[in-house]
Amino acid sequence: MSAAISPNQASTDSADSTAADDACYLALKTRDARFDGRFFTAVTSTGIYCRPVCKVRCPKRENCRFFPLAAQAEQAGFRPCLRCRPELAPSGARQGSWSEGGAVVWSVQDASCILAQQAARLLDAPDAWSNGLNSMSTLAERLGVSERHVRRIFEAHWGVSPLQYWQTRRLLTAKQLLTDTSLPVAQVALLSGFASVRRFNDAFVGHYRLQPRALRKVASKGGGLGPGESAEDALVLRAAYRPPYDVAAMLQFFATHQIEGMEHVDMTQQTVTRTLSITPAGASKPLQGWVQARFVPDSCTVMLRISTSLGPALPTVLARLRAWLDLDADPQAINALLIADFPGTEGLRVPGTLDGFELAVRAVLGQQITVAAARTLGTRLVARYGEPFVAQTGSWAAIRSASCPPPALRAPALPTQNALPPSLLPGIDRLFPSASTLAAADPNVLGQLGIVKQRQKAIQALAQAVLQGTLSLHPGADVAATMAALQALPGIGPWTAHYIALRALRWPDAFPAGDVALHKALGVQDQPHPQHAAEAESQRWRPWRSYAVLRAWSRLNVISAPLKQRAPPTKSKPP
């Protein structure tokens, strides 16, 4: 199977890929959700390409072509299926390079592979679409190489040109917004990275042979809303993931760590709700809103409700939600490497975050104390320094105009303000404190909240670094540079840095080798140098050591246990 889904190998290369295509066809016939997003099936008799889970009648084998990327299928002249909707598939091959066993290799890569992945991450990032990334010269400049070099490396690795990859990414984003929301076409064009409605219409019709407004028929039928859900106070979209997924474990993790006034988990309804502040690229001030994720039972689907006030940053919010819930993980590849050592943990995911700075502060607050105590400190911090939450209402264009108005789409009136919709949860009325707020916080007041001086210094150093732009805490940031920058700050050692890398940077190979509970789970606690023994033991789990850590903690039932059992002294430095 790996030959057919390798991103740098065409589906007609050799006899090996023919056999792999046969395996793809078998997955297609059985609608195996484990392969969703790992390949797309193009049907020559219809000109349409589909996800492996598409519910239409299975096409004949001789009419099928298989592509690792949607961009490759579109480059070959195929259009996305309107029923299975390829834009909803979990991210697949573009998340990394593939080894012979089908696993993504993050830790050991050649320079060309790293460059191709960096380019893809830039093209995937919604913030870049509205922040000047609109040409090959800009992409090459950000990567520090020539246009010719980045084009050659990208095409060799991904099988399509950078511009074709980017165009497909934008058009599929637009397709989802057109289908699932009632946003004006002009706003969809803007959010999808197009400079004008005319360019958007030309690209959409040219690629899909379909007018953008034609997709409104699908949206008018409900857009996939569940029982009791309404799109009146929110944008409602769906997201897919590959099974297995331990929903109960993920929700329990969030419930154990939730901060009162800012987030809430309902285990019965399988929902997690929280507030969010986000600053779109080029905006003068942040947008404030709320998000809710509801796991649909007996389905590999999450319904995402996003307040209309976050509409101007919708693609960015969607990307963060997927990372927060770890929806793009590939359980098949991960389990192939880990299941022998961690049986019964097939569905465990690594919880992410919606805000890297928030996660870093919460990690510092949790050093050397129990999770319950860390929650108490977090609740006090949010109550004292968190900004009161008000949701912006009114027209979507007015909300956008208030933050980062494009001249062509400027709205005449500002939005009104009101509280969180009562259909959600009362009591969610605060936002997590911003970096500027915590950087200016009075140490005496922080002390009155129960935060010791060492943690105060660490939190304020984090805030200053984020404000100065010397520390980036989001997926795609340079892991080595970020971890070095973190450990250069007072009060932050290897354990905290690895924990931040694991959850905020979404680095799948993070491994806090000094973790005491990890030593116990691996049975190395009595060795002379347990940290070195744990590091040596972990080598066979690369590049999925973050998942191994979560599975080891679950073995001891310490995912929600006292952090003081897990974290070594924060002053410790790597050898």
What is each model feature region?
Residues 1-575:
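HhH-family (HhH-GPD) DNA N-glycosylase catalytic core used in base-excision repair
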